[in-house]
Amino acid sequence: MNKKDVIIVGAGPSGIFTAYELLQLNNNLKITIIEKGKPIEKRNCPINKIGKCIQCKPCCNITCGFAGAGAFSDAKLSLYDKDSEEVLVGGNLPTIIGNQETKNLIDYCDKIYLQFGADPKIEGIENKNEILEIKNKAKENNKFNRHSY
């Protein structure tokens, strides 16, 4: 039997980054990532052909598999305007750990994405006022978030 040092369940962004971080600490680790989704080349959604969700098994072909739903998204990450103090996209993290620490973590993750070939051009940041308006509307209409930060 081939022994592993670490087994990670789930190949979404958290699982992938966990493996990456562990290998930065010790590049001799034997890591296995277990993912219930199909290989990326076999992931497709039949909704456009048949007009409705068929509840793919064992899980949704869009959300399950390597890179999670991000494999088929617009690859939106939590980023911020370098000329502003405001973190424009990314939820409540700045409220929890502060703007500067959030920016440090975003920069760290962005650097890794760029290292692996991500496009360095940031789309949409020129629409700062529109982004802030959408963000504020989302906050106002979020009846499900009962957390107080």
Predicted regions and their residues:
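Conserved N-terminal/central alpha/beta ligand/cofactor-binding core
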Residues: 39-43, 47-149
